[in-house]
Curated annotation (Swiss-Prot):
GO terms for biological process: defense response to bacterium; innate immune response. Keywords: Antibiotic, Antimicrobial, Defensin, Disulfide bond, Secreted, Signal. Has antibacterial activity. Its main location: secreted. Belongs to the beta-defensin family. This is Beta-defensin 108B. It comes from Homo sapiens (Human). It is found in: Secreted. Disulfide bonds join C28-C55, C35-C49, C39-C56. Residues 1-22 form the signal peptide. Specifically expressed in testis. Low expression is detected also in liver.
Length: 73
């Protein structure tokens, strides 16, 4: 019975395939953040990851706010 449990554990851990780049995606302290060399135009820089890359957080759907300064007549 121990051999069956051991074989199950070995096959279970071997089935966990690494991503194509050979390492797990590192995430930053924010739940939706990701570590990149440079943040995209639709992301903001919110901190640093453990590998010293910027932690980028997607902006999402932000409403566009028009300027409220009065126009000169």
């Amino acid at each position: 019975m121990r051999i069956a449990v051991l074989l199950f554990a070995i096959f279970f851990f071997m089935s966990q395939v690494l991503p194509a780049r050979g390492k797990f995606k590192e995430i930053c302290e924010r739940p939706n953040g990701s570590c990149r060399d440079f943040c995209l135009e639709t992301e903001i820089h919110v901190g640093r990851c453990l590998n010293s890359q910027p932690c980028c957080l997607p902006l999402g759907h932000q409403p566009r706010i028009e300027s409220t300064t009065p126009k000169k007549d």
